[in-house]
Amino acid sequence: MAIYLYKTSTPSTRNGAVDSQVKSNPRNNLIYGQHHCGKGRNARGIITARHRGGGHKRLYRKIDFRRNANDIYGRIVTIEYDPNRNAYICLIHYGDGEKRYILHPRGAIIGDTIVSGTEVPIKMGNALPLTDMPLGTAIHNIEITLGKGGQLARAAGAVAKLIAKEGKSATLKLPSGEVRLISKNCSATVGQVGNVGVNQKSLGRAGSKRWLGKRPVVRGVVMNPVDHPHGGGEGRAPIGRKKPVTPWGYPALGRRTRKRKKYSETLILRRRSK
């Protein structure tokens, strides 16, 4: 893909880049409107998720996470931008006339063919059960529950690795560093999710962040005592505590937040690394 760099005519265009092959004209039968639920508020209007709100209007793209069109070859027709995720999506035209969106695998170009099923080649973009994959395969869009569709490793640049198969389970190393067990009958897609360098992209200005629905993050130490436990003091004052806390007084920065006695506790062999 050709990457075009912006000419530095203003500070906001400095180090900016755009992918020439990525389009933004979705099919009408694969998109639908949705209630704008990204404001970070509940039904009463109370803020439940800070630093969210505003943003450009979005249409949801219907993504095929199940990949259940078995043994039907499809061709990549377009690679498109999706405002609802960091990864790109690509439109697939299947041999039976059906059209679906899937996550764009890294390295896939327009004209490539993909297929899903039980006995398909180990090729980038193909979807098949874990039991049919060799050890060491790089995968994404991994199912946790059989038939529910991919739920793991779906973000831009995400990739997991199949490291072992024993009995009815397969052992995966996830992008977070967590090692866990999953049923061998669950399916996954071969390869890595595309748009790998999205975290290195320069937004250029604060307005670009606001278009994404993200509001400014203010440090608690510069607030007033009524607004945050770290607030108050004259000038640049320390937080006044041994350890930092959240705006509601709970320990922050290091406290484990995972619930105990969770159903998947026995399936996790090694917790994620930070």
Swiss-Prot record:
Biological process GO terms, please? mitochondrial translation
- Kindly give the Pfam families that the UniProt entry links to this protein: Ribosomal_L2, Ribosomal_L2_C
Residues covered by region (Disordered): 224-252
Q: Does the record bear Signal in its keywords?
A: no
Q: Does the keyword Electron transport apply?
A: no
Q: Which InterPro entries match?
A: NA-bd_OB-fold (IPR012340), Rib_uL2_dom2 (IPR014722), Ribosomal_uL2 (IPR002171), Ribosomal_uL2_bac/org-type (IPR005880), Ribosomal_uL2_C (IPR022669), Ribosomal_uL2_CS (IPR022671), Ribosomal_uL2_dom3 (IPR014726), Ribosomal_uL2_RNA-bd_dom (IPR022666)
Output the Gene Ontology terms for molecular function. Answer: rRNA binding; structural constituent of ribosome; transferase activity
The family annotation for this protein states: Belongs to the universal ribosomal protein uL2 family.
According to the record's subunit comment, the protein's assembly and interactions are:
Part of the 50S ribosomal subunit.
Q: Mind telling me which NCBIfam families this protein's record contains?
A: rplB_bact (TIGR01171)
This chain belongs to which protein, by name? Large ribosomal subunit protein uL2cz/uL2cy
